[in-house]
């Protein structure tokens, strides 16, 4: 993983849905764009959380810029993530595996 510079743009506790919501900016060197997995690891390290509790919802990158603006959610428990997140988000973030994929 390349050197990543992580900044929190906005953070709020959503007590109703048992999660923390984070808008962030990640700047990276002249290398490939960080994957969702890389971003989940970065968030887990910064927030002292388990990767299985983190949902990387959106990432937006402008062409030619080495910067990502994104939105992620950190749940209190995996059960809350499974309850409130749609299946496609759980599959994207590897919290749920499609049947038949080995």
From Swiss-Prot:
Q: Which family is this sequence assigned to?
A: Belongs to the eukaryotic ribosomal protein eS24 family.
Q: Which Pfam families match?
A: Ribosomal_S24e (PF01282)
What is any one GO biological process for this UniProt entry?
translation
HAMAP family assigned: Ribosomal_eS24
Q: What is this protein called?
A: Small ribosomal subunit protein eS24
Q: Look up and give the organism this protein is from.
A: Picrophilus torridus (strain ATCC 700027 / DSM 9790 / JCM 10055 / NBRC 100828 / KAW 2/3)
Gene that produces this protein: rps24e
Give the UniProt entry's GO cellular component terms.
ribonucleoprotein complex; ribosome
Entry keyword annotation includes Protein transport: no
Q: Which UniProt keywords apply?
A: Ribonucleoprotein, Ribosomal protein
